[in-house]
Amino acid sequence: MHLFGVANWLIKDTIKKQYDNVIFMARDGYLPMKAYELLKKIYKNAPKESYLYVSRKALIPASIINRNDLYKLSEVLNVNKYTPRKVIKYIKSCIDSRKNVEEILLENNIKMDEKFKSIVEFNNFMSVISNELFDEKKNEENLSKIKAYFNEFFTGKSCAFDVGYSARPEMYISKLLNINLDTYFININHEEAFEHSKIGKFDLNIFFDYKPTFTGNVRELVLSNTAPSCIGYNTDKEKAEPVFEESIYEYKELWTIHTMQKGALEFIDDLITIFGESIERLDYQKYYISLPHEMYLQSATEIDKKVLSCIYFEDDLRTDGHINVVELWNNEIKYHNQHKINELLDFYSYGNYKTNDEKIAEAQSLILNNRSKPIKLIYYTLFDRVTLRRRFKEIFGKHKIIMFCANVPYQGAKKIKNMIKGRK
């Protein structure tokens, strides 16, 4: 339902605004494009769709218009995870190949394989690249070929679709091609998306009018193409060509993702078969049509999450490695302190509602579970004197001497406490 809602919103709005082309960007634009293609059976005058191989990695060279742009890479890279050698891998298209890079860096006390410890170190490194290694002519030739490659897609009145979130890639492309690349997002995370749209002078259209709790990993995974990711563009030939990394998925991962995607597309195909052209008149709110999808992301049971436990999420730019999707998922739930929907329903349902006293008793049982008697005595003395008196009576009620000996210091301590509080 969520996929149908997104694709139907996109196709109706792009027809209304009379775009000629819709360019689906990056791997997570793949499944929305497939849904868009299905809906074109109903919407005959829909803009032409195309798929652009692009990623944050691939766009790094395109973002370096001049040497000053080198310093902006810290906005894209988690610099503490990187060494000069790894950064150079992304910016080699603007470095003078006639010079010995490692030797020049060593002369400036920069070691190729030592991670940056601060943004200051990173900027010092970029200063050396800018002043001693930057090849302006080579960079211009590289940009010219990338620009020609992108221009093949952005003809006529074009717009882009992406899951989200920052609009930085769209800003880079807008500046490179000198166009206003109007963009459609499912959601954004921060106001920086609007800042980038102002810089790029393009309109930003957003499916959700709120920020979902969960963005990234799982949301992107189920929408993404399982083909290898584009990691750059080969400009050695006359015409730029996308360069792909090796496939990161094994059969079990491919089967899981393809099965989920196949089901989503079959659902849309069934809607088309059942409703036909009446789909254009279906009345619904975007929030509610996406609610089952959002509930799954926020409130999936552990057994439902296990479906994706064989998959690892790749994010070299930020985390410098591969992380299990379910681990990321659970971490995000903990980070946002989110309750699952069934927990909220249990809390507010009449039969399962717990009073504050019941909640306190439940918390105490967890705190004191398997604790020694001295620890329990200290806890009750400090925090729960009612339980302390009750337990003493239960254990020593028949021993009057012990009860008397315990009561004297207890009453004395109670009087001192009341005096401190100003009571009589």
Language-model regions, residue ranges each:
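Long, low-complexity, Lys/Arg-enriched
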Residues: M1-K424
